[in-house]
């Protein structure tokens, strides 16, 4: 709001945007004020100004409010001034809908996380990812605390759906349908495992949705020089063998270089499937199947 006034945009905001908008996303808010009284002024106050301006122009377009789980004022949020200001904003929106008939979409977001979020500010996940990626210390007061997390890409998908009238509702409120529940200690353990993976050539289990999202988030904090790391090339007279990636459930990926006339392998596996992709040169790969007679050895060129 202050930025709008300082740039002379306040009048444009009130006269043009609020008059002509087809949908309003109210994502503005105050979460780190210098004094606690700014919570109410920034969260409730701005919401009041926004709705009054829409009402003055007779614009009853849908209005979305970004609220917080802290507005429940339950448990550790019971004395939250931030939560109280968000709850006041919610009540204002619901009353506005009753008096004008305008649709309101109130989202009580839990903890949000995602790529490039500002660390050491308002997100524990951002701080943990940044500090662990840079080998900085972190502090976890209670690893057993249960976190309810929503990934920012899922938030964006939901808001786009809301714009098209396909929001997910739960009673009076709207919600992002994908919420991940995990302890604080579990988050830290996962991020620390990401930090160690280049040394073991491992990759996370990306079949798990939360792990995939957290790993993507972690990578956005990784220093540029750590995107590459050395590989060990095992060299002998026959050529070389270099492991590239190891997985916990899908084997490994490697580069095998064989010199001309060299035979490698000459062993078998009872429970294993190997795939070869020839990227340069040519060779003969004989394959033996136990159900074939001894003299039957198919070969692949």
Where do the protein language model's features map onto the residues?
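A conserved pocket-lining segment of Rossmann-fold NAD(P)-dependent short-chain dehydrogenase/reductase
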Residues: 127-150, 169-172, 176
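Mid/C-terminal beta-alpha module of Rossmann-like enzyme folds, strongest
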Residues: 161-233
């Amino acid at each position: 709001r202050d930025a709008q006034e300082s740039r002379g945009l306040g009048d444009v905001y009130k006269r043009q945007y609020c008059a002509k908008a087809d949908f309003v996303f109210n994502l503005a808010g105050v979460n780190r004020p210098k004094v606690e009284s700014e919570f109410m002024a920034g969260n409730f106050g701005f919401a009041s100004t926004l709705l009054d301006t829409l009402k003055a122009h007779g614009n009853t377009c849908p209005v979305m409010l970004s609220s917080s789980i802290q507005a429940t004022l339950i448990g550790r949020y019971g004395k939250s001034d931030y939560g109280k200001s968000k709850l006041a904003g919610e009540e204002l929106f619901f009353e506005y809908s009753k008096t004008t008939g305008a649709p309101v979409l109130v989202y009580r977001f839990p903890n949000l996380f995602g790529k490039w979020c500002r660390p050491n500010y308002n997100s524990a996940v951002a701080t943990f990812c940044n500090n662990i990626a840079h080998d900085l210390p972190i502090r976890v007061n209670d690893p057993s605390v249960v976190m309810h997390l929503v990934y920012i890409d899922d938030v964006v998908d939901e808001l786009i759906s809301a714009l098209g009238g396909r929001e997910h509702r739960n009673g009076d409120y709207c919600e992002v349908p994908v919420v991940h529940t995990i302890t604080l200690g579990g988050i830290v353990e996962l991020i620390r495992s990401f930090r160690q993976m280049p040394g073991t050539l491992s990759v996370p289990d990306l079949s798990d949705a939360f792990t995939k999202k957290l790993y993507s988030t972690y990578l956005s904090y990784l220093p540029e020089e750590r995107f590459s790391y050395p590989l060990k090339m095992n060299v002998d007279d026959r050529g070389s063998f270099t492991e590239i990636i190891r997985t916990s459930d899908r084997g490994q990926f490697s580069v095998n270089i064989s010199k001309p006339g060299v035979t490698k392998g000459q062993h078998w596996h009872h429970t294993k499937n190997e795939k070869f992709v020839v990227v340069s040169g040519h060779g003969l790969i004989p394959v033996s199947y136990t159900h074939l007679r001894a003299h039957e050895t198919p070969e692949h060129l």
